[in-house]
Amino acid sequence: MEAIEEFYTEDASMQENANPPRVGRDTLVAHERAALARMSNVHSKCVSSAVEGDRVAIHWNFELTEKSGKVRRFDEVAWQEWRGDRIFRERFFYDPTKIVT
């Protein structure tokens, strides 16, 4: 959540696959807080990244452990668009069947 507060514009948006985007830094922080509250452990690893001007693509590996003990592993690509030193748009691409609870 600190990363969202520090590195995202006030009007930033995040979008999961083809779902409607969430808009506004406060909304993004609240969503992240709720998602993390369902987990007992979150492990992420940056596999690779590419930067072209104000656009960044990051390939992530995630391992999420729910409070029930169920573990979910998945790959994700985050596509970021930056405005200066902050992200104003981010979209995530992943197989939703890997993380649906």
PLM ranges: what are they?
Residues 38, 64-73:
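Short, cysteine-centered beta-strand-loop-beta hairpins and adjacent loop/turn segments enriched
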Residues 62-64, 82:
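Hydrophobic beta-strand positions in extracellular immunoglobulin-like domains
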Residues 1-53:
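A solvent-exposed, acidic/Ser-Thr-rich amphipathic alpha-helical stretch
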Residues 75-101:
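Short beta-strand edge/turn micro-motifs at domain boundaries
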Residues 26, 68-71, 99-101:
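A short, polar/proline- and glycine-enriched secondary-structure boundary/capping micro-motif
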Residues 43-45, 59, 72-78:
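Short, surface-exposed coil-to-beta transition loops
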Residues 51-62:
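A short hydrophobic beta-strand element
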